[in-house]
Amino acid sequence: MSDNVIEVREVQKRYGTFTAVDGISFDVKRGELFGLLGPNGAGKTSTIRMIYGFSPLSGGSLRVFGHDITTGWRDVRARLGVCHQEDSLDEEMSVRDNLEIFAGFFGIPRAVARDRANRLLEFFGLENREKASVRELSGGMMRRLAIARALINEPDLLILDEPTTGLDPQTRHQLWEKLARLKNQGVTIILTTHYMEEAAQLCDRLIIVDHGKILVEGRPRDLVAQFVGKQIIESSPVCEGLRRFVTERGLEHEDLGHRMLIYCKDDENIYHEITKTYCQDNCILRMGTLEDVFLKLTGRELRE
Amino acid sequence: MSQSAPQLSWRLLRVWRRDWLVTRKSWLIGFMTPLLEPILYITSLGFGFRILIPEIQYEGHTLTYVVFMAPAIIATNIMYTAFMENSFSSFVRMYYQKTYDAIRATPLSVDEIIAGEIMWGATKSLMAATIMATVLSLFGLVRYPTGLGLLPLAFLGGLLFGAIGMLFTAFVKSIDMFNLPIFLLITPMYLFSGTFFPLENLPNWAQSVAWALPLTHLVSLARNLCLGTVSWMNVLVSGGYLLAATMLLVPLALRLMRRRLIQ
Ligand SMILES: Nc1ncnc2c1ncn2[C@@H]1O[C@H](COP(=O)(O)OP(=O)(O)OP(=O)(O)O)[C@@H](O)[C@H]1O
Ligand SMILES: [Mg+2]
């Protein structure tokens, strides 16, 4: 078997006449933490749903653990865990029962399920709330429980659709640390997120999709270097002199009206030149980020 | 995942088990309703109508009103229990709690989830009927051994009315829309299926309509099992009707739910 846990080939997803995923191809390697980024409605959830056989493909082919998902979905699902974008915890049950009863769907014996539930409750810091009903949990606890539940079958592949949306920074950082530990244990992880900082920190590799198509694929740092450079000059407000200077020098830039981004690649002298001559106070030199890449590639208009 | 043939296996029992474990937590409510309902009916209708309807003619037998009506309490409860479970409750699990979505990340097919849910609805009907039959037995209103036939009847009726509930779950956009089938289908059946008066009292055309409805057959069998007057003809016709309708509507419910859920 190849080293790829997921192989996506020319996959399409249509809802009626609307094409949500438009022929995308990518691989996720064993042990990798792979990111799926894109604006709202880009087709991330649609893609993820096809990966675990929730949603049938409209075209192309998709293999997970070497199985064709269309025919081998049962074997595939036995070895993966999913944390949905929308909460799908069982509100009628306690925290512990959510884990133990879910284990039943995988046919895990009860004693084993109890054992694993103990470990997962501890791993996610929920052991004191095990008897609480899901309704009593905070958003962060619910999300932790949802991820814990996705791990009850000790999956080789963990699929997380926006696992950190709506969480406070503390919980988010704690989750990153848990994900890093899972990755160290050899779990392959694919995740979607709207937090670019998160993607930059966590992902070994990522793709940015828009309108159902892949725009770029690569390592976060490489993408930053390739598309925006290590450093960016940001000026706000923008004076006319600066506008002229940038055009004359033919610098790659983005003029947002009240704000201007100048991609100076690795040329630090430009910054000194600008601050000496033009707006001293309104100009900063900062690191290029994945967010810059994202906005540059997907544009700044609102979606949906 | 496939759109055509149902994908069923014993895994559907895992869904059944989930429902059982969740329901077990509130067992007292589940236990009290079928315990008290027959007592309420018997005291209210039984004593209330005792003077108005001293006795009633049913298929050549002369019965007191309580003896006539008691089996219908079980039959209508079988209908309501499974229908409610696979309409309102299943809809809540599907739509609000996303329970089905969660289970669809495990090695279970949509067919198994829905079949497990219908099986659970039937199990609830069976449990309620068992409790009700026990209570009615204490009042001497169930004859044995034929009364034991109520148990398989409850399960079969539960499958059928659960499937009917699930058919509507496959269509409704919001939970309020279940009031429509209740008003147009369930309540008329409750009133006109030989439940509270013998069908012979109805004009011929209305009798024919009544015999087309599943509850009429469920009531007829339940009554004859309780009275000890059940005939093979009865079992063949009404049992055959219920079985055929179940074998038709359960696969139809699976198919329509697949269409709703698999997108
Ligand atoms: N079941 C469906 N029926 C019809 N259209 C759908 C369905 N599911 C998704 N879509 C549409 O497909 C497109 C992609 O949706 P998808 O949920 O995959 O986006 P996403 O990238 O996950 O977005 P978000 O970041 O908002 O979660 C959207 O335009 C959405 O409206
Ligand atoms: Mg999404």
What are these regions (language model features)?
Chain B
Residues 1-144, 152-263:
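Hydrophobic transmembrane alpha-helices and immediately adjacent juxtamembrane helices
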